[in-house]
Amino acid sequence: MFSGCTALKNINIPSTVKDISRGAFRNDCNLTSIVIPNAIKVIKDNLFDGCSKLNSITFGNGVEIIGFDAFRKCSSLTNVYLPDSVRYIGSYAFHMCKSLCKVSLPKDIKTVSGSAFVKCNLLTAIDYRGTMEQWKTVSTRSTPINYKNKIKVIHCIDGDIKI
């Protein structure tokens, strides 16, 4: 679709769009911001993989799934606030986002692949908008959430979990 396009800088996807093809914006090296509408439920695999200048993502309240490598190598991304609708973050979703230092997860998330934040070396903590007891029910599959990164703590609304 737009993969490898160098002219795109900002994308505001129309609210009528319900689906975007896998890898559609892959390696769009000048893309800096994206607004994802409420109608999009799945951020498909590799959708923004390699968008090295992407520094702003506004997620619609309908997003439920973040796919494999969805934001891999988005090296300018510093903050990610996932809406309450997100239930699943796939493997390597934010792999090698070397500037990522803040992530906020919704309380009703079910699965965060342990490899989702591999090589996000500035990310030392995750903000979880649920309780410590609720965090215990979040699956990281077979890999711990601090796999190949520097995450040391999960900040919950009622305290911290050191890992």
Q: For each of these PLM feature ranges, what is it?
A:
Residues 145-147:
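Short mixed-charge
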Residues 5-19, 29-42, 52-65, 75-88, ...:
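Structural signature of tandem-repeat unit edges
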Residues 118, 138-143:
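A structural signal for leucine-rich repeat
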Residues 1-3, 21-26, 44-49, 67-72, ...:
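Consensus positions within tandem repeat domains that build extended binding/scaffold surfaces
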